[in-house]
Every structure is written in structure tokens, then in C-alpha cells.
Swiss-Prot record:
Xref: NCBIfam families: PRK03606.1-2, PRK13395.1
SUPFAM superfamilies assigned to the protein according to its UniProt record, in alphabetical order: RmlC-like cupins (SSF51182)
Keyword terms: Lyase, Purine metabolism
UniProt keyword Lyase present: yes
Name recorded for this polypeptide: Ureidoglycolate lyase
Gene Ontology molecular function terms on file: ureidoglycolate hydrolase activity; ureidoglycolate lyase activity
A Pfam family it matches: Ureidogly_lyase
Amino acid sequence: MRTLTIEPLTKEAFAPFGDVIETEGSDYFMINNGSTRRYHKLATVETAAPEDQAIISIFAAEALEMPLVIRMLERHPLGSQAFIPLLGHPFLVVVAPLGDAPVPGHVRAFRSNGRQGVNYHRGVWHHPVLTIEKRDEFLVVDRSGSGNNCDEYFFTEDQQLLLDPQQVSR
């Protein structure tokens, strides 16, 4: 079983999968009589149809036992999905490029520093939310509308991957 190496979450490394939502290194302009920095358009919400709506939810997540066997990934073919940590805790992200099915050899893992969120582009394969804290909360921005917006892909046993938070790239 291949063990994923967890990479630091950077805009450049994550670009094939979506957007890193963070203020560090991002452009801003002043608003509210000069008292507020607006970090504008850090990500774009994608929806497939004009009648779709962008919605905001809160996910209250519990940690899964680690190391974790990655048995499946999901994608949202009709819209993007963003996760923004509300409690400032680091969390893990597992993704694979666009395609009919995720290729195990192309799956990558990242660690958010707790001040970064992610916006998965429409159709990008990813694991459901992976907190490393006992409990965590995320502001989620995604799509509401008709049609199935969640495809799941289950790896065969020989394709499964191992996610170990100790396997960090240096």
C-alpha cells in the first residue's frame, strides 16, 4: 500500500485542484474609510446551471482514526466546494486530478496551516473533510440545485492508499 507524503499547502502546488484561500501573499485594497483590508476574490464559486445557488453551510467534523486507509474519493461535477477552517486548526486535504476516475498514482495530500482554506474546482476528486483535531468546524461554500452533485469512487483493495500525518515532506 502506497503511503501518501503530505505536502505543505501552497497556491502553486494546489493550483491543479483548486484555490488556496488565504490572506498571506494575497493582494488587497482598503475599504471602510481605511480601517479594513479587503482580500478580494480569493476563490471563485462555480455552479453548472443558471438556476443553481451558491450556499454557505457549517460542517462540524470529527477526526478519523489515523493513519487512515484512503478507500474512496468524491467529486462534485456541478459546482465547486470550499472549506474554510473556523477554529484555526490545521487539517488535511487529499486530492486527485480531473478525470473519469481518480488514478491512485496521481493522488496527493496537503496540510493546511489552519489559516488556509481550500476551494475544490468543479469535478476535482477529493476525500471528504479530514480534520486532525478531535472536533473541528468549517465554513463551506458550495452549490445547491437539482441533479446529482456527488460522485463517489471506491478504490479496489490493491489501489488503496495510506494517509499518515507523520509522513510530511520536508
